[in-house]
Amino acid sequence: MDRLRLPTLPRRTFIEVMVGGLLAAPRAADAQQPRVYRVGVVLQGGPYLGAVDGLRKGLAELGLEEGKQVVLHVRDGKGDLKAVEQAAGDLEREKVDLIYSVATSVTLAVKQATKKVPIVFNTGNDPVTFGLVQSFRKPGGRLTGTFSRSTDLIGKRLELLKEMVPRLRRVVTFYNPDTPSSELRMKVARDAARQLKVELLARRVASVEELRAGLRALRTGEADAYCSTADATVISQTALIIDTARAKKLPTMFIEQESVTQGGLASYGVSYSAIGRLSARYVQQILLGAHPGDLPVEQIDRFYFVINLKTAKALGLTIPQSLLQRADEVIACPEKADASRGC
């Protein structure tokens, strides 16, 4: 009986088929890999880094885990707006999917340095006033995010500081006159100080180096306390401010609760960790196809009053019980101390 003979391929054709199959296999595997999104983060360091931690947590809760579904490219300007602009331009050229910016001056710099990349921001000043969006409800353009009213709360911080430091007569603050929001912030601060009958010692510092020099030059007893006015250049050096205040026995009032956990006396304002967590929703929606201009800006109305009793004790301050009861968080005294008496 004749054997059944199967058709055979010419040798050259056989090799081409085999090689083609081997090359196609990796392509098929690649096609099944989920997309990894790339998110640039631009800020000025210091307490602002809390927003990065919050962003990571928020994205993970939304199913975007860092290192798996998303990669964060964090750029710290360390108080230098030129470094911020450079970082933003570099990130766009590296084709990140989105940039997350923290602080008004940083967001303005990021917008200026980029052309197409979507931007999710947190600002302490009205984003409409500063031309970042057209309106809260319909931002338009490629920017959206959150607004935390840090400038509006300067008066409240001074008021709380005066309650904690009854002898308060002179308050020192530092600000960078080159930041776009400096004029507005200092007007709010001066008006509030005038109403509280407190002298505001406003020191101009155009760079981190000038701030460091200004802190070194501050004489013990020259001021009765320090109050932050939401300047990003200054906030980037919060650790140095806290160290200087400790050495000069100077009570401090900050914006963000992260500064109090580092040793500041008190804060009234935002939690950057909470802001980052909230911002993750915007980031997720844009990565999945939403247009920034269609996502309404959210105004943050949750503020935290935090007191560090350990710092109060070191300063020899007794915090009134009425203030302790109003605080959202009190960092406790050492064991066996009477917290109700301010340690």
Regions found by a protein language model. Give the residues of each.
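Short hydrophobic alpha-helices and adjacent helix-cap/hinge residues
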Residues: M1-C343
